[in-house]
């Protein structure tokens, strides 16, 4: 009996330290909470959650596996009401699913029984490598995760098709299956001494694709910041950047665009409900990137003149924030970056639909539109003119809204437990309500919370809030809602609380 009790204590401790990163959510003083800058992006984190134990590799001592409760058989049926989706982060759930089709099948049954109508399965995490068949990118074989008291590499030794396993299980129980990809991500410099991993670290020909950042000591490739201390990053004027974490591509690089379009074409071969772009943006340096020669040539073409002092005519070394509401050149830089993301999304939508006309195409974004321009993204409709409401917005910024190229949008309404109802932007309800006029009817959207990382959620025990959360999100988004992330539902055992909230919603129809 004592042994069993000890095992459950170990599992509880591991759960407390898993899933520690989220999809992006920023600081806002109205929350009274400390929030990290984007791991950005979603469904946009982190940037990397982690999870309960499973074998790491044959040579690593194994801890007890996460217990899986048996689920009753599920008969597919027509869903009632709006969409109810759950995000399944690759790294955060790798221990459970990387080497077990059975666990995928069992949890998909439980997801269905809880009242969800679909899942969003992450198939390209921040260290790059994919969990689907691709002629473009290597298969993912490992992620960094917390194992036996420290971060270690968790390896995938099975060769079954990870994404297809979710699709098959989804069809069996009647769940929609979306696949998400961390898009403008080139690799990851992992913490706790694990070091670099991913495409740009394993392929020297790709290193020129990485963002070039404007620092106090000149222009530096993002990989040159690997492992630097917080103090050193402050000296370089990039305090919001991290010495560890995801490294980003330059979205203006034509070779990057071609590579990612081929990757998405591979993904579109699957019988999916849809494809969702995550972290389809610039990196976490405000306006500090990308200042490569590639971007300089494209920016000069965009404005129709040469920039004599690069990058000083736009931003002084180490400066990545607007001067007031932005100088004329800074506003041109803002529009240019939004155009680069817009043009990629348009091309990606066209490429995906050329392979699979019936698939839904969309993106995850943070719902905080008022400051999301720092990520180089205008996720609104081109029919919405932000310059009417926001002094930072250039007159042409509306031209680079990309919502009209999407079939669905996922917005992260990542407010804390004390900010669920409300009309302001920094509440779950407000996030969801305020998105509708921005999309201007161009695209249906779902919104939802991060129930593991936002303030008030980090220690669990918030099941009583699920009816309030469901009401705030599902009734104020045109298509429905989502939860981030499945690992948090499992960690804090929110299954019954969410089921009750969904049942209450369906009874109201």
Regions found by a protein language model. Give the residues of each.
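Bacterial Sec-dependent N-terminal signal peptides
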Residues: 16-79
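Active-site-adjacent "subsite" loops/lids of carbohydrate-active enzymes
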Residues: 80-101, 178-270, 326
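Aromatic- and glycine-enriched glycan-recognition loops and surfaces
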Residues: 96-114, 143-173, 255-259, 340-344, ...
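Catalytic domains of carbohydrate-active enzymes, especially glycoside hydrolases
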Residues: 102-129, 270-274, 398-411, 475-481
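Aromatic-lined carbohydrate-binding/catalytic grooves of carbohydrate-active enzymes
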Residues: 116-158
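Aromatic- and acidic-residue-enriched segments that line the glycan-binding/catalytic groove
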Residues: 131-145, 186-240, 279-320, 374-385
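Substrate-binding cleft/loops of secretory-pathway carbohydrate-active enzymes
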Residues: 186-190, 194, 285, 355-424, ...
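Substrate-binding cleft of secreted/luminal carbohydrate-active enzymes
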Residues: 394-509
